[in-house]
Curated annotation (Swiss-Prot):
The presence of a 'disulfide through disulfide knot' structurally defines this protein as a knottin. This is U8-theraphotoxin-Cg1a 2. Residues 22-29 form a propeptide. It is found in: Secreted.
Length: 62
């Protein structure tokens, strides 16, 4: 009985972590990731990244 309760608790915790990670990924959509091109007219670089000039790629930013 104790083992079943522990499995249920760990299963719910894993489900919560998975849904949290998915939600974070969905909020970051629409931005350019590390070393992606960042030409004008494209979405901006993701948070923490900056577009470099003249190479126009997203790198760790200011």
């Amino acid at each position: 009985m104790k083992t079943l309760v522990l499995f249920i608790i760990f299963g719910l915790a894993a489900l919560f972590l998975l849904s949290s990670a998915t939600e974070l990924e969905e909020t970051e959509r629409g931005c350019q990731k590390f070393f992606w091109t960042c030409h004008p007219g494209q979405p901006p670089c993701c948070s923490g990244l900056a577009c470099t000039w003249p190479t126009e790629i997203c790198i760790l930013g200011r």
